[in-house]
A protein has these predicted regions:
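Short alpha-helix capping/helix-loop boundary micro-motifs
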Residues: 78-85
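Core nucleotidyl-transferase/polymerase catalytic module
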Residues: 75
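Long, compositionally biased stretches
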Residues: 1-71, 90-97
Length: 98
């Protein structure tokens, strides 16, 4: 819960509980990111956060220090449920503006 409170204080949005993982055609390294430190939320890894747009909606890429995902997969958080709101299914193609 604490990470959601930190996110709210930094962005003003209340996160939907859950993430949307997007596989990109090429690897992606975060740019212009900010960090939620492990000490801030009581975790074991820093979390890197970069703003983006998914289907024209404001969202954030989150990546932990030691992510289990390949570098061409980005994990998205937002205040909306993309799967429900846009009827998304696995393997769908969507637009992401980074």
């Amino acid at each position: 819960k604490k990470i959601e409170n930190i996110f709210y204080s930094k962005t003003g949005i209340k996160l939907f509980h859950g993430t949307l993982n997007i596989e990109l055609e090429t690897p992606y390294e975060l740019e212009n990111y900010w960090i939620i430190g492990k000490d801030e939320y009581g975790g074991t890894q820093d979390v890197y956060v970069q703003e983006c747009k998914v289907l024209k909606q404001k969202a954030y890429i989150v990546r932990s220090e030691k992510t289990a995902h390949k570098s061409n997969v980005i994990e998205i958080v937002s205040d909306i449920n993309f799967r429900e709101n846009f009827n998304l299914k696995d393997e769908d193609y969507i637009s992401v503006k980074i």
